[in-house]
């Protein structure tokens, strides 16, 4: 920065009196009030320039475009910068002949402000300051790292860790302070009322801007090498010492030794540990315990002494004995209006800076590579749903699914996954992060289903509409009645056990079909000029008659094998029609059916599978005739169009005939209804008859598909008309084929040949209306990021875009452009604008779009760990808005395990996955299960019980129990009996771990469900095993007891929880026996006074009146397992369970997400 004597600046030169402010907004709190005092008198700055030829001879470390703040009204202009040696050069562009140069010998670099929304930073030299602005935060971090490497004379590598993590250099940023603050370099107060200056984002080291270059490199330790001579060595190895920082203590600071007030607002005095946050007087410092306990977050911290070596790839290798369950933190610095920057700094202050990473600076790969050698670790992602998906995808690439559990801290806009896992919809207070880390330590683990979005791009002809236009609906209205009648009576024939109902429905069905054919023939006579359409209609009517005759023959064969009381109506009189031969055969078949039903017979009954196939064939034939009839009615009012599109046959393929070796349909009819290109498309989508029959035979031995859908026999118009009524409940599952052989079942459902994985879905998938709104919002955010920097603004934009779609109705006929299949079964769609596929019960920012969380008579309760998807319809934006306050259910479509969506036409359709939207070209989209991820869910029941116990302890002792005090004094030794009991408990736990590992080789779910508990318990046991019992202290014994108890609860919940895990016979007895042994030993441990309240809360003694009320029926720490109670009840039916045995033994059932 120029002094007062500097009178001239060239265009684009350094600014006079510029301050560290944002280029978009500068508040008074961001201005540097000590700018003039820092110079120590006027100094004349001589401008130094170099030619491009002189610069070319030096090696370039980094170069590129940056914005530079100028002297005229603090405007920003683009300049080209080159860092070569310890000099920074800049000019208007890279081809300029003259470059200004800045000497970096005594320079320091600092971020411009606290939130730093515009990625600006300042280069501070004794003579000038350069305010620069990068395009994104990663580029800013790269420039700062390269400038620091020049100062430290260390090689700069972007691909590895930032050098400041290991060099001890401070990471400066400009900020103001609310109270008097002192410089840690010159010990003088920071200038101005707001004490504006530089602060290290990791260790809170304070400095004037002029003093920053003279600050010692004593930032927070990261590795064993950074500790240096302060390391503590004893007979057990190395120990973690305190790392003290002098002065600037809070007003309420008290000495941990003498319990007196320490610190001062008048001078720099007294000390604070950067790890355990203990504060001491200078005189008391030597009296304090030298070993640092790491404080409140010790479980999550990787101690610097643990990072003591590097592997062949250059990554640090951790010593596992120091880390039970370390925490890896990923922060998206852009999330929450750049609130991520504040959380990034706060986590570096609480944890080891080497375990905190910015997703915007290198992504998650670097952190996962550092932690991949750990047997068990936790991950905390601070950001939105997109950040979580990014980290999970990288976990898949490194194959770390079994080693890590992932938690979410919501900083984004939607945060649907965080809501479901119990972490809330938003989080803005960085001062509460220690409490968040505590809750994360007490969280339970649940499995999250993850789904692959497989795409196959293929241009398909436009899908023919099954519904005539409303103006021409006079004839179509009657045809709709016909089809509804056929579907209704077919359902009665298939489901009714009363023969009188079957006879009546068969009679009405015959009359309806004959009348329907006659109506179609009359409509056909009016369009004889279009021979192609007329021939198609005639062929379809012929096929319809054949299908009805086949159904009657199947019923006739079934009637010969059953006894039914007589009571038959009169024969149906024949009617004149064009197909007279077919009419006569139908009448004869019907009369024969009526007569045969009344005759007793002892022959074996025909399989109902054949009747089911004939009924489905008849329904398809009716639908095909309606398609052709709809085109005929279009010909009456609209000008003649092209021949019938063959793509309509795709909706109802004739696969059932090939499966039953039924060749009654004439080849001429098929050749007429299918063009060569349609046959090619059909061949691409379905297998041939041989493959179909083979697949059908294999599916006959499989259990019934767990697919719950709306009746596939319903037309789109019928489904739309009764969408909100109770008829859906009655028709649900009506026509699902229990033999797995309906013609709608895809015989090659699991084949993904030719498909590519577009992305992975964790939350939800949307196509149509909601995806269009998300796509427009994402485009708006990319064009104007300053308008979308807060959740409130984002919600307002969603409202504006949704209102616009309410008027435009861009996808009002989406059912005509897409086709939906659930578990291979075709789903007729009502009139809708979008389809949503849900994996979690939270959609678009907290909406329960499924409309409930409980099981009913039709659908199962939605869950994100059942490998089942929920499919719902999106009718309009009003429905999406109303569903935020009202639980709507009329738009439910299905629950299934796979979803297939076919996009027809030439134009793409908007698609979104977890809020990320794009335009998907025509083709096929398949949603199939990929894998499962371990997610950390907040366990409020356990937190409540633990808080009640802590309150009870406070009431008994009369003062709060500080967690850090447990580690200040040496742990007490155990008595002989206590050592013996701990030995037996450890042996029982080791036996249980062995049995679980043996069973997990066959039952993967057992290993996934207990993996974290097994690892934690093994680490706790290994601490005491090398020198047992000498190495056993109360702290170690307490840790062992807690981990053994957690393993017991986890295993019990899997064996006897809401969905018990079925093990094979030998493994089940072994695991149960080992679990019972652990239960007995845990009961013995409750006799030890200092372990009683940890393993079993006191339910008999009520707390004093001034204490928080405890839940006396809490079963979080209940020892007796549920399966033991059930076994005792079977043996002694007269015994009654106790009041504490009426609840489930698994506290996970009360956790969010269930």
UniProtKB/Swiss-Prot annotation:
Its EC number is 2.7.1.107. GO terms for molecular function: ATP binding; ATP-dependent diacylglycerol kinase activity; zinc ion binding. It comes from Mesocricetus auratus. One of its GO terms (cellular component) is actin cytoskeleton. This is Diacylglycerol kinase eta. Residues 656-667 have a biased composition (Basic and acidic residues). Expressed in a wide variety of tissues. Most abundant in the brain and testis; also found in lung, spleen, and prostate (at protein level). It is an enzyme of class 2 (transferase). The keyword Cell inner membrane does not apply. The lineage of its organism: Eukaryota, Metazoa, Chordata, Craniata, Vertebrata. It comes from the Eukaryota. Pathway: Lipid metabolism; glycerolipid metabolism. Diacylglycerol kinase that converts diacylglycerol/DAG into phosphatidic acid/phosphatidate/PA and regulates the respective levels of these two bioactive lipids. Thereby, acts as a central switch between the signaling pathways activated by these second messengers with different cellular targets and opposite effects in numerous biological processes. Plays a key role in promoting cell growth. Activates the Ras/B-Raf/C-Raf/MEK/ERK signaling pathway induced by EGF. Regulates the recruitment of RAF1 and BRAF from cytoplasm to membranes and their heterodimerization. Residues 1-54, 560-608, 634-678, 1123-1154 are annotated as: Disordered. The keyword ATP-binding applies.
């Amino acid at each position: 920065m120029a002094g007062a004597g500097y009178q001239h600046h060239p265009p684009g030169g350094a600014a006079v009196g510029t301050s560290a402010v944002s280029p978009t907004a500068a508040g008074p709190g961001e201005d540097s009030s000590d700018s003039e005092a820092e110079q120590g008198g006027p100094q004349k700055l001589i401008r130094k320039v170099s030619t491009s030829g002189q610069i070319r001879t030096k090696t370039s470390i980094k170069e590129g475009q940056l914005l530079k703040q100028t002297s005229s009204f603090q405007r920003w202009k683009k300049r080209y910068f080159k860092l070569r040696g310890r000099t920074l050069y800049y000019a208007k562009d890279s081809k300029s002949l003259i470059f200004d140069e800045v000497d970096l010998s005594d320079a320091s670099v600092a971020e411009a402000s606290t939130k730093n929304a515009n990625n600006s930073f300042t280069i501070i030299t004794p003579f000038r300051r350069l305010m620069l602005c990068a395009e994104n935060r990663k580029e800013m971090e790269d420039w700062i790292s390269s400038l620091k490497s020049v100062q430290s004379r260390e090689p700069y590598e972007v691909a590895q860790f930032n050098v400041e993590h290991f060099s001890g250099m401070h990471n400066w940023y400009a900020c103001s302070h609310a109270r008097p603050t002192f410089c840690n370099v010159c010990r003088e107060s920071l200038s101005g009322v707001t004490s504006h200056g530089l602060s290290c984002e990791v260790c809170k080291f304070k400095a004037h801007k002029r003093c920053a270059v003279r600050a010692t490199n004593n930032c927070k330790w990261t590795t064993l090498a950074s500790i240096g001579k302060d390391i503590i060595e004893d007979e057990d190895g190395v120990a973690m010492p305190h790392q003290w920082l002098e002065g600037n203590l809070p007003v309420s600071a008290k000495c941990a030794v003498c319990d007196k007030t320490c610190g001062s607002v008048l001078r720099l005095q007294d000390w604070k540990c950067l790890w355990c946050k203990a504060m001491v007087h200078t005189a008391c410092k030597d009296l304090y315990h030298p070993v640092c306990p790491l404080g409140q977050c010790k479980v999550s911290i990787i101690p610097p002494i643990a990072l003591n070596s590097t592997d062949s790839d250059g990554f640090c290798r951790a010593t596992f004995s120091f880390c039970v369950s370390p925490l890896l933190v990923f922060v998206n610095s852009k999330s929450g209006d750049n609130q991520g920057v504040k959380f990034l700094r706060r986590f570096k202050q609480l944890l080891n800076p080497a375990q905190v990473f910015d997703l915007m600076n290198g992504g998650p790969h670097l952190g996962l590579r550092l932690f991949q050698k750990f047997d068990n670790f936790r991950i905390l992602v601070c950001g939105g749903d997109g950040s979580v998906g990014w980290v999970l995808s990288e976990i898949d690439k490194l194959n770390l699914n079994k080693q890590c559990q992932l938690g979410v801290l919501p900083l984004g806009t939607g945060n649907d996954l965080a809501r479901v896992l119990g972490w809330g919809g938003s989080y803005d207070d960085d001062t509460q992060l220690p409490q968040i880390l505590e809750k994360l330590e007490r969280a339970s683990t649940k499995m999250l289903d993850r789904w692959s979005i497989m795409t196959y791009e293929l241009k398909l002809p436009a899908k023919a509409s099954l519904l005539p236009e409303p103006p021409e609906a006079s004839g179509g209205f009657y045809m709709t009645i016909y089809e509804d009648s056929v579907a209704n009576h077919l359902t009665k024939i298939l489901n009714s056990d009363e023969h009188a109902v079957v006879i009546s429905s068969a009679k009405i069905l015959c009359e309806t079909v004959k009348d329907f054919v006659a109506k179609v023939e009359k409509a056909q006579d009016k369009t004889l000029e279009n021979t192609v359409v007329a021939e198609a209609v005639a062929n379809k009517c012929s096929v319809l008659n054949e299908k009805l005759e086949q159904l009657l023959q199947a019923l006739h064969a079934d009637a010969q094998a059953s006894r039914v009381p007589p009571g038959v109506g009169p024969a149906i009189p024949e009617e004149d029609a064009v197909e007279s031969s077919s009419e006569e055969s139908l009448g004869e078949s019907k009369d024969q059916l009526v007569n045969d039903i009344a005759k007793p017979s002892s022959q074996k009954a025909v399989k109902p599978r054949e009747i089911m196939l004939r009924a489905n064939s008849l329904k398809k034939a009716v639908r095909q005739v309606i398609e052709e009839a709809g085109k005929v009615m279009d010909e009456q009012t609209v000008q003649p169009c092209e021949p019938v599109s063959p793509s309509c046959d795709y909706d109802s393929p004739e696969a059932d005939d090939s499966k039953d070796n039924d060749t009654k349909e004439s080849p001429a009819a098929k050749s007429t209804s299918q063009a060569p290109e349609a046959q090619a498309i059909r061949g691409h989508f379905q297998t041939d008859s041989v493959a179909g029959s083979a697949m059908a035979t294999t599916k006959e031995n499989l259990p019934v598909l767990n697919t719950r859908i709306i009746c596939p026999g319903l037309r789109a118009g019928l489904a739309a008309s009764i969408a909100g009524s109770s008829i859906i409940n009655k028709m649900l599952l009506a026509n699902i084929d229990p033999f797995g052989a309906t013609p709608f079942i895809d015989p090659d459902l699991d084949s993904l040949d030719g498909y590519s994985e577009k992305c992975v879905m964790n939350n939800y998938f949307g196509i149509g209306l909601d995806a269009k709104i998300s796509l427009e919002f994402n485009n708006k955010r990319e064009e104007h990021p300053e308008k979308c920097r807060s959740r409130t603004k984002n919600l307002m934009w969603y409202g504006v875009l949704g209102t616009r779609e309410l008027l435009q109705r861009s996808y009002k006929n989406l059912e005509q452009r897409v086709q939906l299949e659930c578990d291979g079964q075709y789903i007729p769609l009502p009139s809708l604008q979008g389809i949503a596929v849900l994996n979690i019960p939270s959609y678009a920012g907290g909406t329960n779009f499924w409309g409930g969380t409980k099981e009913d008579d039709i659908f199962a309760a939605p869950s994100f760990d059942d490998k089942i998807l929920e499919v719902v319809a999106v009718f309009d934006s009003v429905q999406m808005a109303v569903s935020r306050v009202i639980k709507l259910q009329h738009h439910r479509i299905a629950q299934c395990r796979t979803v297939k969506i076919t996009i027809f036409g030439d134009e793409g359709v908007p698609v979104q996955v977890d809020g990320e939207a794009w335009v998907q070209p025509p083709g096929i989209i398949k949603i199939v299960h990929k894998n499962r991820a371990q997610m950390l869910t907040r366990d409020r029941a356990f937190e409540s019980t633990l808080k009640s116990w802590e309150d009870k302890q406070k009431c008994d002792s009369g003062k709060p129990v500080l967690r850090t005090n447990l580690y200040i004094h040496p742990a007490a030794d155990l008595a002989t009996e206590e050592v013996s009991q701990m030995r037996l408990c450890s042996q029982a736990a080791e036996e249980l771990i062995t049995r679980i590992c043996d069973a997990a080789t066959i039952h993967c779910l057992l290993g996934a469900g207990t993996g974290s508990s097994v690892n934690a318990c093994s680490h706790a046991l290994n601490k005491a095993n090398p020198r047992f019992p000498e190495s056993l202290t109360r702290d170690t014994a307490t840790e062992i007891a807690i981990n053994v108890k957690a393993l017991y609860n986890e295993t019990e919940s899997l064996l006897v929880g809401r969905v018990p895990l079925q093990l094979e016979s030998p493994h089940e007895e072994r695991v149960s026996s080992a679990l019972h042994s652990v239960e007995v030993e845990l009961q013995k441990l409750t006799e030890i006074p200092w372990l009683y309240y940890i393993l079993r809360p006191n339910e008999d003694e009520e707390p004093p009146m001034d204490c928080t009320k405890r839940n006396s029926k809490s079963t979080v720490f209940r020892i007796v397992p549920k399966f033991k109670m059930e076994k005792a009840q079977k043996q002694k039916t007269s015994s009654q369970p106790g009041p504490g045995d009426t609840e489930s033994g698994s506290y996970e059932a009360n956790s969010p997400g269930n």
